């Protein structure tokens, strides 16, 4: 009986002990503060009752806000020489510190917020100084990111498509290297309030496999500062320079090789018989017109600039060679027909010669004498008073030398034809050699001497 009572006593004490412990835990749980909901936390952090004013920059009346920028290039293309601009699609990322947004009440180290919250915080007034057109992306939702860290750091990322101005120097076109810039500038805050700077690591990133149709995007990207001075103050500005080397493949196929073949085609006339005037003239005119069309086509996609481009020199020289080939046949034809003109002139002169003109004949001494032989009167018909005939009046008995016999028409024809053929033979060698020398100078000058260095840009 005694042992039973003792056991019941210990059991009762155990029940009372656990009951008291459970009661204390329940009281502690009821007295512990409840975790704050995300909505309550955001209202406390940047709501109306938080005292946060998005119209006032961080560190107001204090040091300027340092904004670190980074861009990621999704696509790069549509480089237009006529309008001198280029199109690019990027992620623009800005990071700065806003002490008013630092927190300890929430367990997460960072908060990814809805883009609608962007209107509730202060943001830098960044714009692109050389922008000609731009738009945001809203498919399927606003392509914007807002992230706030525990220490008050803010990350703002946005996807935009830009059309930026890119002044081009086309003197070496199509063997040129162009430098296109992207300038990021503050619109309203001077450097006393806001300073832009490039991110130390990976300030400019390019998507893997990014290729351009006519250019090679150089890996060297110059990151510079371009502080702007206006009447309203000194404004922060940073810029990125993209070096683009043009690929010649398209222009070799579409311009250089066709024009080269046209020039070579014009030389075929040197092997065509000089009497085949329709064939040689037709070939010459066709090549000239084709070369003119080719030259006009090369300028169609380029702006009207005041200086001479490399492609202009090539087209002009090719047109000159083609036109010279046509003029060469004109010279050949003229020389080959000279004997006919000379014979026609001689016949015309003999036809209009009057018998009275034979009264005077010029000997080698240039003395004029009457010639009575035209009237059937010999020298003995006229006697002077002293018995000396008139013909012997100059007191010399020497006879005039016989004139050199003139060449026959057939000999003259062969002479002029040989001269014309000689012009063709010289042209067969001279034209290709001259064009080869031009090519040597042209490619050496534009590919070696005047080759552009991106580091000197």
Curated annotation (Swiss-Prot):
CC per GO annotation: calyx of Held; chloride channel complex; dendrite; endoplasmic reticulum; external side of plasma membrane; glycinergic synapse; inhibitory synapse; intracellular membrane-bounded organelle
Membrane topology: Multi-pass membrane protein
Amino-acid positions noted as binding strychnine in the UniProt annotation, renumbered to this chain: 230-235
Residues the record marks as site: Important for obstruction of the ion pore in the closed conformation: 289
Activity control: Channel opening is triggered by extracellular glycine. Channel characteristics depend on the subunit composition; heteropentameric channels are activated by lower glycine levels and display faster desensitization. Channel opening is also triggered by taurine and beta-alanine. Inhibited by strychnine. Inhibited by picrotoxin.
GO biological process: acrosome reaction; adult walking behavior; cellular response to amino acid stimulus; cellular response to ethanol; cellular response to zinc ion; chemical synaptic transmission; chloride transmembrane transport; chloride transport
Major localization listed first in the record, in broad terms: membrane
Record-annotated disulphide pairs: 166-180, 226-237
Reactions this protein catalyses: chloride(in) = chloride(out)
Transmembrane stretches, start-end: 251-272, 278-298, 310-330, 426-446
Chain positions recorded as glycine 2 binding sites: 232
Entry keyword annotation includes Flavoprotein: no
Keyword line: Cell membrane, Cell projection, Chloride, Chloride channel, Disulfide bond, Glycoprotein, Ion channel, Ion transport, Ligand-gated ion channel, Membrane, Metal-binding, Postsynaptic cell membrane, Receptor, Signal, Synapse, Transmembrane, Transmembrane helix, Transport, Zinc
Glycosylation sites: 66
Compartments, record wording: Postsynaptic cell membrane; Synapse; Perikaryon; Cell projection, Dendrite
Record carries keyword Cytoplasm: no
Record-linked Pfam families: Neur_chan_LBD, Neur_chan_memb
GO molecular function: extracellularly glycine-gated chloride channel activity; extracellularly glycine-gated ion channel activity; glycine binding; identical protein binding; ligand-gated monoatomic ion channel activity involved in regulation of presynaptic membrane potential; protein-containing complex binding; taurine binding; transmembrane signaling receptor activity
Cytoplasmic topological domain residue ranges: 273-277, 331-425
Tissues in which the protein is found: Detected in spinal cord (at protein level). Detected in spinal cord and brain stem.
Residues given in the record as Zn(2+) binding sites: 220, 222, 243
Additional remark text: The alpha subunit binds strychnine.
Family as reported in the entry's similarity comment: Belongs to the ligand-gated ion channel (TC 1.A.9) family. Glycine receptor (TC 1.A.9.3) subfamily. GLRA1 sub-subfamily.
Subunit structure: Interacts with GLRB to form heteropentameric channels; this is probably the predominant form in vivo. Heteropentamer composed of four GLRA1 subunits and one GLRB subunit. Heteropentamer composed of two GLRA1 and three GLRB. Heteropentamer composed of three GLRA1 and two GLRB. Homopentamer (in vitro). Both homopentamers and heteropentamers form functional ion channels, but their characteristics are subtly different.
Record comment regarding domains: The channel pore is formed by pentameric assembly of the second transmembrane domain from all five subunits. In the absence of the extracellular domain, the channel is in a constitutively open conformation. Channel opening is effected by an outward rotation of the transmembrane domains that increases the diameter of the pore.
Protein name: Glycine receptor subunit alpha-1
Organism of derivation: Rattus norvegicus (Rat)
